[in-house]
């Protein structure tokens, strides 16, 4: 793959990442889990900042726009939820929804790490060292940290079987941790 193709794939994935984080923010807001909502709001902003940084780096080093690449508009919120009201969601359904959302988040971060790691290797193989270093320093290392955090939270929630009391109790901690 050329540098242009690698960065086109990265940018498309970053755009998809902002959409993913925004949907998770909406989902947790709907579920009235304000700490998790704020956490994904924070990740949305980080994704947006990363996209701008990637664009700026490419523009400075390649002196051109990143080529366009197909962007998926997949919905991560179940379609039938669009007709629900908050009051329609009982504790069992909410528990299942949180479990599903956390699994999707971990999977998203794994896919992102795989893409960025593969991109790094392809750029190195193409002798595009400065582009490879950017991907490593700004994308691979960042997503590695986010994946470790997501997996840790996922395991924590799995260990308590997504207990609703526990979920409610930790929301203020996440609100505080990810305060603007």
Name every feature range the model reports, one short phrase each.
Residues 1-180:
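Iron-associated oxidoreductase/ferritin-like identity signal
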